[in-house]
């Protein structure tokens, strides 16, 4: 590991952010710290993760939502001090890493199936 990678790992450890596991297709709520004049407040941004880029300290993700009938996308830096928290609301079942095709879709065709938790199969021998 070279010097830059070591410094990035130390910075990530110093930030000690609680980042949940999420992937493209998941619906997340990102609470963003917004400064308006002298006031500071948290603003919730809820949408579907359409992309995630894992690059250590430079990791980011794109969240897409429909606001007043218009598609709005916002890119967040994963380790940004502006992000107060990230909450996974719903897991999505998709087969792609980048869901850019959702940009051309609207309505029912833009829906994403929910990933249900795996059911454990109990054999008859173990049940007896």
Swiss-Prot record:
GO biological process: translation
Keyword set, alphabetical order: Ribonucleoprotein, Ribosomal protein
SUPFAM superfamilies given in the database record: Translation proteins SH3-like domain
Matches recorded under Gene3D superfamilies: 2.30.30.790
Keyword RNA-binding in record: no
Function recorded in the entry: This protein is located at the 30S-50S ribosomal subunit interface and may play a role in the structure and function of the aminoacyl-tRNA binding site.
Name under which the protein is recorded: Large ribosomal subunit protein bL19
Organism annotation: Herminiimonas arsenicoxydans
Phylogenetic lineage: Bacteria, Pseudomonadati, Pseudomonadota, Betaproteobacteria, Burkholderiales
GN (gene name): rplS
